[in-house]
Amino acid sequence: MERPEEGKQSPPPQPWGRLLRLGAEEGEPHVLLRKREWTIGRRRGCDLSFPSNKLVSGDHCRIVVDEKSGQVTLEDTSTSGTVINKLKVVKKQTCPLQTGDVIYLVYRKNEPEHNVAYLYESLSEKQGMTQESFEANKENVFHGTKDTSGAGAGRGADPRVPPSSPATQVCFEEPQPSTSTSDLFPTASASSTEPSPAGRERSSSCGSGGGGISPKGSGPSVASDEVSSFASALPDRKTASFSSLEPQDQEDLEPVKKKMRGDGDLDLNGQLLVAQPRRNAQTVHEDVRAAAGKPDKMEETLTCIICQDLLHDCVSLQPCMHTFCAACYSGWMERSSLCPTCRCPVERICKNHILNNLVEAYLIQHPDKSRSEEDVQSMDARNKITQDMLQPKVRRSFSDEEGSSEDLLELSDVDSESSDISQPYVVCRQCPEYRRQAAQPPHCPAPEGEPGAPQALGDAPSTSVSLTTAVQDYVCPLQGSHALCTCCFQPMPDRRAEREQDPRVAPQQCAVCLQPFCHLYWGCTRTGCYGCLAPFCELNLGDKCLDGVLNNNSYESDILKNYLATRGLTWKNMLTESLVALQRGVFLLSDYRVTGDTVLCYCCGLRSFRELTYQYRQNIPASELPVAVTSRPDCYWGRNCRTQVKAHHAMKFNHICEQTRFKN
């Protein structure tokens, strides 16, 4: 086993550092750091393992000592980051460790009993600290409101205080500004630099403890960005505070030095922070990278934020498209109809086959990151999403602020005991239960996007001008069939079969693609909807429908727009003229069923509009076009040319023509 060196002497057979668990039970042994590289994480193969704590990443971080200089650094390899004192160190970043640093693997702002924190102590003679200072540091961490105004006043008068390093002096003169709302650790750094002779004797005789320690500690899962809200730096953490502003995938420390030179608020003393440890950190970084492969960005992308593990049988939520394990979201949707990540109202739950295939391919290359068989069986048993489905209805709803915003699994806007998710329950505006809910007093406006809330649909602005009597008086039968609007994803009564018998029922589907739309039935409520379903002659295609309308050829499309503008015509006038030509048989469409009265959705209508626009442009007399347009030679490939999207080629050749070469 490799040992760190001290000068030119051979290393003694003893640990070079130790970790003291903050808030640990009496009698729990300290973690002695004996190896050159010490790994911490949830994976059972780590030197310090937390197999039951889902808030700790599989490979959370590693502590490495440089054999030549004795410099100790911590490198973060987690998905959520590691907190040193009050500074968050993110993935692939290294930070030098000093005696008295508090390392948080899990931080709970309002529930400190769930924290997983260790106090680092160097056992070398140059960086040794007394046991009394550690006790004071631990007390200050858990009692952050203690006044420390006089803690630093007597530091200069105490002859027992060792001389401060240049880095420490600069840090105390220029503390890094805080970005949090409160000072969480006001005394941790000050108290950690006050040793006493009695404490030094105690620190030399530390308890024994080895690798492979698996401390207890598991808590409810939280979002991975929870610790980012208190990333204010302690005085002795200024070096890492600047490195934390760099990209996470930075491979060396040289750009950090350049950035510090470029900052206007740093002087020559500030550069001393990285002058000495930079070479050591580079050496350690290269050794660590050669020793073991780092978790790549693919693993971070394929990680579920609820269980903090690789996705298993993942599902995506619509419309926000955030992805979770099916078993994880099954437990969440019992309590809330909001997305765990963005709090957007969930309308539909779908299997994400692409991500599932990516996870399988990733596990083939990294079989060590596979879940255990017991974990897989447990998740399959908890999975209640076996097929694509609507978001289950939640009966009782409350405001998001009523739950704990710190705990992802405990945050809930509903009472889980009253939830009924045995069957997906769809309620539309014309269901009797929806009317009963609408008759009740108005709710708190927080869950306004939830299914069943009157504000979500009934009061939303509609794109429909008026509703017929057949639509207004209709009431859904018990367990009646519903169709989901392809535009706004809101349910409506499925009356397409009834329309064949009663023409008064508004159309609910496109005549070409047969997809359901609610615009003609009661008005689509999606923001930005121009009217997703209408007769072709009444379809609103928007003012930008002429952009690239001619085979995505912007140059030819601009020629047409200029032609219409000089004659005071709009796209609606052109559509009217084209439909008249279509009725006479002058223009033709690829779908012969489409006429001016055919009910089309926006996409199918835009496709037919582009076909008519090409024929309209083709029939413009050459005398009505500029000479620069008519003097261009025809392209061999004509309208089928794949290069016409390039401006230079489009300006040089005419593409409103048929292909003349290689037509077979």
From Swiss-Prot:
Changing I306A: Abolishes autoubiquitination. Does not affect phosphorylation. Residues 1-21, 142-267, 388-417, 439-461 are annotated as: Disordered. Changing R632A: Abolishes poly(ADP-ribose)-binding and poly-ADP-ribosylation by PARP1. Residues 38-89 form the FHA domain. Residues 400-417 have a biased composition (Acidic residues). Changing C635A: Abolishes poly(ADP-ribose)-binding and poly-ADP-ribosylation by PARP1. GO terms for biological process: cell division; meiotic spindle checkpoint signaling; mitotic G2/M transition checkpoint; positive regulation of proteasomal ubiquitin-dependent protein catabolic process; positive regulation of protein ubiquitination; protein destabilization; protein polyubiquitination; ubiquitin-dependent protein catabolic process. Pfam families: FHA, zf-C3HC4_2, zf-CRD. It comes from the Eukaryota. Pathway: Protein modification; protein ubiquitination. GO terms for cellular component: nucleus; PML body. The modification Phosphoserine is found at S244. E3 ubiquitin-protein ligase that functions in the antephase checkpoint by actively delaying passage into mitosis in response to microtubule poisons. Acts in early prophase before chromosome condensation, when the centrosome move apart from each other along the periphery of the nucleus. Probably involved in signaling the presence of mitotic stress caused by microtubule poisons by mediating the 'Lys-48'-linked ubiquitination of target proteins, leading to their degradation by the proteasome. Promotes the ubiquitination and subsequent degradation of AURKA and PLK1. The PBZ-type zinc finger (also named CYR) mediates non-covalent poly(ADP-ribose)-binding. Poly(ADP-ribose)-binding is dependent on the presence of zinc and is required for its function in antephase checkpoint. The FHA domain plays a key role in the anti-proliferative properties of the protein and is involved in initiating a cell cycle arrest at G2/M. The FHA domain may be required to interact with phosphorylated proteins. CHFR is silenced in many primary cancers because of CpG methylation and deacetylated histones on its promoter region. This however raises the question of whether CHFR silencing is a consequence or a cause of primary cancers. This is E3 ubiquitin-protein ligase CHFR. It comes from Homo sapiens (Human). The lineage of its organism: Eukaryota, Metazoa, Chordata, Craniata, Vertebrata. The gene is CHFR.
